[in-house]
Amino acid sequence: TLMRSSAASDVYKRQVQGVLRFLGRGGGQVFPARLTVADTALDVRAFCDTGFSVQEPLSSRAVVLVRFGAVQSRLPPALGTYLEQHFAGAAPLPVPALGVRLVPCTTVAGHCILPAVPASLCCTGSPAGQGRAEHLYAAFADLPPPPDGWEVLVGVEAGEMIHPLRHRQA
């Protein structure tokens, strides 16, 4: 069973890396942001990737991708424990009290399901009241650190809420 969990974990990591490789495009810069999940504010390094686009299927809300290892020690204990069990291959049922939903991601590399919770994100370098993306979902992925060190990957929809002028075409 442990061997099966390890193999499933390896397949999962390859699938999520495929999400990033086939949906993602480089060229942006990492910026300071504050991600709020489960009533906990986390200061993070975010990266806006114009090729990343995932929505929570029931609400159609934008999803940001969070590297679990980068924020694991700062999460509320109940959420951290749930995510640890999920990434260990235990496949726990979503916890309604945490607002966990399972978000499907599909690429040419395959299909994976990511645990996600309601979230908001703001750029900490913007004036108060500006640059805030509300009503998002933060999907967690067990990924190694990328070369540029981002902790949260933001797609165009959430990116436009945070930096409204940066993404508009002339």
Please place each PLM-identified region on the residue numbering.
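Membrane-water interface at the C-terminal end of transmembrane alpha helices
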Residues: K13-R21
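A short secondary-structure junction signal
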Residues: F22-G24, R45, P57-R61, L75-A78
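N-terminal signal-anchor transmembrane helix
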Residues: R25-V30
